[in-house]
Amino acid sequence: MAQVAVVSASHWTQAYLGLPYIMGVGECAHRAALVWRQEFGFEVEPPPAHGDMTVAQRHIEAELAKPEWCRVRRPMEGDAVVMWKGNRVCHVGVWVAPGHVLHCTRKDGMVLTPVEDLEPQGFRVFGYFRWQEQVAMAA
C-alpha cells in the first residue's frame, strides 16, 4: 500500500494512524466520525455496532442524505470522501490536504492514502461531502 509522508510528525493525523479496524465499532465510518468529532467539532452518528456491512452501507447513504451534508466538487480538509464498489457506497474517509484520505481498512487500520491510490485498492471515489458548518467556513 502506498503511504507517503505528506504531513509532519506533529500533524493532527498522526494521532489516528495505526488505529485498528474493529468489526462493528471501529470500521471506516466509526473512525471517520471520531475524527470529525475530535478534530472538526461536529457529531456524525456512526453505524449501529453489529458489523453488518449492508446496514453500514445503508447508514452511510442515509447520513449523506441529511441536510447537514452538501456535496462539493473540490474537497477541503475534513470533508467526507465517499467511495463505492459497483453501485453501492462501501467506504468513507476524511480528506486531508494535499490530496490524501485518512481512512480505516480491514487490513491496515487507519491509514493516510494518496487519493490516486484509492482506486487501485478497490475504492472508487463517489464524491466529496462537506458538513454544513464547514460549508460556511469555506465560503
Q: What is the predicted role of each segment?
A:
Residues 16, 39, 91:
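Short glycine/serine/threonine-biased micro-segments
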Residues 42-43, 47:
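A structural boundary/capping signal
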Residues 19-20, 66:
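Conserved short-loop catalytic and cofactor-binding motifs
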